[in-house]
Amino acid sequence: AANQHLCGSHLVEALYLVCGERGFFYTPNKVGIVEQCCHSPCSLYDLENYCN
């Protein structure tokens, strides 16, 4: 899949899809996934780094 910008609820939905039953860390106030995936495009591999 191509890299894409994912913000807010779109980012959460993508994490649910990628992580499934493993769940994930989502702390919007913490630097990390938002910078990586919202401010700049990220890949599904990047998202997997945030799964539990």
UniProtKB/Swiss-Prot annotation:
<dbReference type="GO" id="GO:0006006">
    <property type="term" value="P:glucose metabolic process"/>
</dbReference>
<dbReference type="Pfam" id="PF00049">
    <property type="entry name" value="Insulin"/>
</dbReference>
<protein>
    <recommendedName>
        <fullName>Insulin</fullName>
    </recommendedName>
</protein>
<keyword id="KW-0964">Secreted</keyword>
<keyword id="KW-1015">Disulfide bond</keyword>
<dbReference type="InterPro" id="IPR022353">
    <property type="entry name" value="Insulin_CS"/>
</dbReference>
<dbReference type="InterPro" id="IPR022352">
    <property type="entry name" value="Insulin_family"/>
</dbReference>
<dbReference type="InterPro" id="IPR004825">
    <property type="entry name" value="Insulin"/>
</dbReference>
<comment type="function">
    <text>Insulin decreases blood glucose concentration. It increases cell permeability to monosaccharides, amino acids and fatty acids. It accelerates glycolysis, the pentose phosphate cycle, and glycogen synthesis in liver.</text>
</comment>
<keyword id="KW-0119">Carbohydrate metabolism</keyword>
<dbReference type="GO" id="GO:0005179">
    <property type="term" value="F:hormone activity"/>
</dbReference>
<keyword id="KW-0372">Hormone</keyword>
<dbReference type="InterPro" id="IPR036438">
    <property type="entry name" value="Insulin-like_sf"/>
</dbReference>
<feature type="disulfide bond" description="Interchain (between B and A chains)">
    <location>
        <begin position="19"/>
        <end position="51"/>
    </location>
</feature>
<dbReference type="InterPro" id="IPR016179">
    <property type="entry name" value="Insulin-like"/>
</dbReference>
<dbReference type="GO" id="GO:0005615">
    <property type="term" value="C:extracellular space"/>
</dbReference>
<feature type="disulfide bond">
    <location>
        <begin position="37"/>
        <end position="42"/>
    </location>
</feature>
<keyword id="KW-0313">Glucose metabolism</keyword>
<feature type="disulfide bond" description="Interchain (between B and A chains)">
    <location>
        <begin position="7"/>
        <end position="38"/>
    </location>
</feature>
<comment type="subunit">
    <text>Heterodimer of a B chain and an A chain linked by two disulfide bonds.</text>
</comment>
<comment type="similarity">
    <text>Belongs to the insulin family.</text>
</comment>
